[in-house]
């Protein structure tokens, strides 16, 4: 492999934002060591033209794959087999890397050989403010930066419940050795990127670098609650794909520590689907028959694979009323008055958290 890092950039109708994304990568100190792989997923705007213009300017650092639309997972599947980097990372085309952090990251990768590398990332809001995400608990950062850890040793201490796509970099050969592929034709498959390789990875390194800049300002993103409400079918399909992967994996190859972590991860994923139905989507879009159907599937999965127990408490951690238990007893969501009260408490607790906890840092 002739590059240190391949960066897969799934692109669909991102003509206006793709230049910012690419400009953040093609900087002195990183340029010669990266491969920016723009995968044009059947864009109907000028995204392909933009990508090709960068390829002409930076032929040694930019590659372009043009393909029919197949949704997010298909872009990963198209890029992974031909990636030249020792390591590989995904960068959505409406997001970007902090350029100075990228150079530092590349310098660190020169002396790293672990299957996973974890960095910080920032969520960038519409007003330009940023919130950095680190793998810490109540302000404690339990891992020594730059040190190689056995992944089981990290998972055993319980600090980490899941990994997020924005913070993950994988060793490319590890993904190829496990035959990694993402589901095509549906959204939210970045969940697979942060889940499946954890079954296989042996070791991990944490770096004190705020690399990925996650753009939360753009309208229409798939994580917007209103968009999720309209895409419940795809959220459900993605959950079923996760369960299919679990059922087909040789679990006997996993240590008890790894298996316990994976089971807890899956429990949290099922809880997230319940949360979408019972807490997130607007009441006028809620269909009780759909909830009954998915409840039967998830209950069966919990019994079959030993997931759970699943409890669904409000995010504010003040009101301790289990929405899933209420559903099983009443076959309905919380009363309207309680949902409104819960929302009020959520707002108050968020305000207090920002005013007190964050300002004390």
Regions found by a protein language model. Give the residues of each.
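Cell-envelope/extracellular polymer assembly enzymes that use nucleotide-activated donors
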Residues: 3-6, 35, 192
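Short, well-formed alpha-helical segments that are part of the catalytic scaffolds
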Residues: 14-27
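A conserved acidic beta->alpha catalytic loop
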Residues: 24, 40-49, 68-70
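Short beta-strand/loop segment that forms part of the nucleotide-sugar
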Residues: 33-42, 63-68, 93
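Glycine-rich, basic loop-to-helix element that forms the pyrophosphate-binding segment
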Residues: 67-83
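Donor-binding/catalytic cores of nucleotide-activated saccharide
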Residues: 72, 76, 93-207, 212-230
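Short aromatic/hydrophobic "clamp" motif used to bind/position activated sugar donors
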Residues: 88
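Membrane-interface aromatic/basic loop that binds lipid-linked glycans or pyrophosphate carriers
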Residues: 278-361
């Amino acid at each position: 492999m002739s590059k240190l890092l391949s960066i897969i950039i799934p692109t669909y109708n991102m003509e206006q934002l793709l230049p910012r994304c690419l400009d953040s990568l093609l900087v002195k100190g990183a340029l010669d060591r990266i491969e920016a792989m723009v995968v044009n997923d059947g864009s109907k705007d000028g995204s392909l033209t933009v990508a090709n213009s960068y390829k002409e300017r930076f032929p040694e650092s930019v590659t372009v794959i043009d393909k029919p639309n197949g949704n997010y997972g298909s872009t990963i599947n198209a890029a992974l087999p031909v990636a030249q980097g020792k390591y590989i990372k995904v960068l959505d085309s409406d997001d970007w890397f902090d350029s100075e952090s990228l150079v530092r990251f590349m310098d660190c990768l020169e002396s790293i050989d672990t299957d996973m590398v974890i960095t910080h990332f920032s969520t960038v809001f519409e007003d330009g403010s940023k919130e950095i995400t680190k793998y810490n608990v109540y302000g404690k950062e339990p891992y020594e930066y730059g040190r190689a850890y056995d992944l089981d040793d990290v998972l055993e201490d319980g600090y980490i419940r899941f990994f997020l796509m924005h913070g993950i970099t994988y060793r490319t050969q590890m993904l190829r050795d496990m035959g990694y592929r993402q589901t095509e034709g549906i959204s939210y498959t970045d969940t697979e990127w942060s889940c499946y390789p954890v079954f296989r990875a042996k070791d991990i390194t944490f770096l004190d670098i705020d690399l990925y800049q996650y753009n939360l300002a753009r309208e229409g993103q798939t994580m917007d609650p209103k968009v999720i409400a309209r895409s419940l079918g795809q959220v459900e399909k993605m959950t079923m794909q996760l369960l299919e992967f679990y059922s087909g994996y040789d679990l006997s190859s996993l240590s008890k520590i790894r298996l316990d972590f994976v089971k807890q991860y899956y429990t949290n994923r099922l809880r997230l689907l319940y949360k979408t139905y019972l807490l997130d989507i607007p009441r006028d879009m809620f269909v009780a028959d759909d909830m009954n159907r998915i409840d039967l599937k998830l209950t069966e999965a919990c019994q079959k694979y030993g997931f759970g127990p699943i409890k669904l408490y409000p995010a504010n951690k003040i009101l301790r009323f289990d929405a899933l238990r209420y559903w099983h007893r009443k076959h309905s969501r919380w009363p309207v008055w309680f949902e409104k009260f819960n929302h009020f408490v959520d707002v108050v607790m968020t305000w207090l958290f920002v005013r007190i906890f964050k300002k004390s840092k």
